[in-house]
């Protein structure tokens, strides 16, 4: 659903945004035109421009919609004007035109919630434009539901306005642990900006003692120590964080930099640090399924720091989820080679193209990322994943061969797992089995490995009792997995315990109702216990679940002829 039509988080816009089409201005007659007028032929009247904006929204063109609504707002008068201006403001905000949104923000609106969003938008634009004192005043008028954002931005506005004491005054944020964490983190950042170094270090260390989620406090403290020339202390800080998050690439890179004793990272600007806080808030909103609010905060963050790649990735993810693929791809193009998020962004962009069946373009993009970042395992494994999706298994395995060889005697079990998939799908089972056994030596309790090898043995009719024990262990570790429960049920089926198989496979279908293989297995089990009508129902259902050609042919044969007599397990 297009972004500007799902603004239920802004109460004044509920009547405009609660469904897949918004209403025309109050004085206009609602007709089918509101859903079908092409933007290219819309008139220049306020109503014509409004309809053009509606059309752009309905086709997922958020930026174009914002332009039309803004022009409509300029042309509207009388009773229609507030309605159109509200559309123009929210469309511009969500499309990322913060300057445009600030220029038409309804700061005098009668609805206090919409007015507070307007204050927040104008304040961010003022802060980014160097009008810190004005921004600080406006942020004092931002309340619920935007109070966390306003509270986090206020100290940065105070610091930019030259009020150091106000800048280090800890904001009071209730019932929002993420915002409270960033308020404390930002206090350390602001102490450093104010050259109160002892207090900055104390603030960072206090956060680390209390858990340091994401190692953000450790990274900030380490960078702070590097800037002070305290290289050994910085390395120790990163080591401590790595003990909690072994292999974290950001921490490893920071440690290597500190160990080299040069190129200490520059202190981020106040605007960039404020943008980081807004980006963190948006992440929590995404988890809460409040995508539009998250997108608004991300757009505001990018007004403060246009090069905040983490924000661009989240923008791309949200736009992908709501169907604005072109805008999402623009967001994924923002991170540049050499930046930490470049490979992740290219991976997402490649899979976006893959989803549109642009397979060659996706592979070209993935190969470009490998060329740009030859040391990146993530770039290489993404290329392997795309090749596997295209059923080019030997090429995928060849990439993994090199990665596994580079890791020496103890390669990452995940690489072995992926190569096993390639080998199994290309009918090289002995090689796949060997990789799975090697991976299990490294991770003997990993449910995915136990299920893969166990199910493969079951399906091949090999080592059935050992295999059943393996998949039972996998199910015990992940009882909500429909795939693993299916493996268990299929194991009982192959052992001839059809009644237990039915029980397990019914549970598997309840956990993953849309899987054609699980439904097929349940149909077979029903048949073996004499429940023929239910068996045919399950097989018929398989045909509605997009089975591959091989499974479709198998099921169609069973619907015609049923299952033959048991020839052994």
Residue ranges and their predicted role:
Residues 20-22:
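Bacterial signal peptide processing site
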Residues 16-18:
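C-terminal motif of bacterial Sec signal peptides marking the signal peptidase cleavage site
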Residues 26-28:
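N-terminal secretory targeting signals
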Residues 12-13:
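Residue-level signal for mature regions of secreted extracellular proteins and peptides
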Residues 1-9:
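Bacterial N-terminal signal peptides that target proteins for export
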Residues 24, 34-58, 67-569:
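Alpha-solenoid helical repeat scaffolds
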């Amino acid at each position: 659903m297009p972004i500007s039509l799902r603004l239920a988080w802004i109460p004044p816009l509920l009547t405009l945004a609660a469904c897949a089409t918004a209403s025309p201005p109050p004085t206009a007659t609602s007709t089918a035109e509101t859903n079908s007028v092409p933007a290219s032929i819309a008139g220049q009247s306020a109503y014509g421009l409004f309809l053009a904006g509606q059309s752009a929204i309905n086709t997922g063109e958020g930026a174009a919609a914002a332009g039309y609504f803004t022009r409509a707002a300029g042309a509207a008068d009388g009773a229609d004007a507030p309605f159109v201006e509200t559309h123009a403001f929210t469309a511009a905000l969500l499309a990322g035109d913060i300057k445009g949104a600030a220029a038409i923000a309804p700061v005098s609106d009668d609805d206090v919630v919409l007015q507070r969003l307007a204050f927040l938008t104008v304040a961010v634009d003022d802060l980014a434009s160097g009008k810190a004192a004005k921004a600080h005043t406006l942020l004092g008028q931002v309340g619920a539901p935007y109070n966390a954002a306003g509270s986090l931005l206020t100290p940065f506005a105070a610091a930019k306005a030259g009020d150091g004491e106000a800048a280090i005054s800890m904001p009071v944020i209730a019932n929002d642990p993420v915002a409270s964490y960033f308020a404390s983190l930002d206090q350390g950042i602001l102490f450093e900006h104010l050259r109160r170094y002892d207090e900055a270090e104390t603030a960072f260390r206090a956060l680390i003692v209390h858990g340091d989620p994401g190692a953000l406090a450790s990274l900030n403290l380490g960078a702070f120590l590097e800037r002070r020339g305290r290289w050994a202390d910085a390395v120790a800080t990163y080591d401590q964080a790595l003990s909690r998050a072994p292999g974290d690439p950001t921490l490893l890179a920071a440690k290597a930099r500190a160990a080299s004793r040069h190129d200490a990272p520059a202190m981020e600007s106040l605007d960039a640090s404020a943008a980081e806080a807004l980006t963190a808030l948006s992440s929590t909103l995404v988890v809460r399924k409040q995508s539009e609010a998250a997108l608004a905060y991300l757009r505001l963050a990018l007004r403060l720091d246009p090069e905040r790649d983490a924000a661009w990735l989240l923008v791309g993810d949200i736009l992908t989820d709501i169907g604005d693929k072109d805008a999402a791809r623009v967001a994924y193009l923002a991170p540049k080679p050499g930046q930490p998020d470049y490979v992740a962004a290219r991976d997402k962009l490649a899979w976006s193209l893959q989803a549109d069946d642009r397979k060659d373009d996706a592979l070209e993009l993935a190969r470009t990322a490998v060329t740009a970042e030859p040391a990146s395992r993530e770039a290489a494994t993404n290329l392997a994943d795309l090749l596997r999706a295209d059923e080019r298994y030997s090429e995928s395995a060849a990439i993994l061969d090199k990665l596994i060889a580079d890791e020496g005697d103890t390669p990452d079990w995940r690489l072995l797992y992926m190569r096993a998939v390639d080998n199994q799908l290309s009918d090289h089972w002995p090689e796949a089995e060997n990789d799975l056994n090697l991976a299990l030596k490294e991770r003997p309790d990993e449910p995915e490995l136990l299920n893969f090898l166990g199910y493969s043995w079951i399906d091949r009719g090999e080592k059935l009792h050992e295999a059943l024990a393996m998949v039972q262990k996998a199910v015990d570790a992940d009882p909500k997995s429909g795939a693993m429960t299916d493996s268990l049920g299929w194991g009982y089926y192959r052992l001839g315990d059809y009644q237990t198989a039915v029980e397990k496979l019914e549970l598997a279908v309840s956990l993953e109702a849309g899987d054609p293989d699980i439904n097929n297995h349940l149909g077979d089990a029903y048949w073996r216990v004499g429940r023929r009508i239910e068996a045919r129902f399950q097989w018929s259902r398989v045909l509605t679940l997009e089975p591959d050609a091989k499974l479709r042919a198998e099921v169609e044969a069973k619907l015609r002829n049923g299952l033959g007599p048991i020839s052994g397990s």
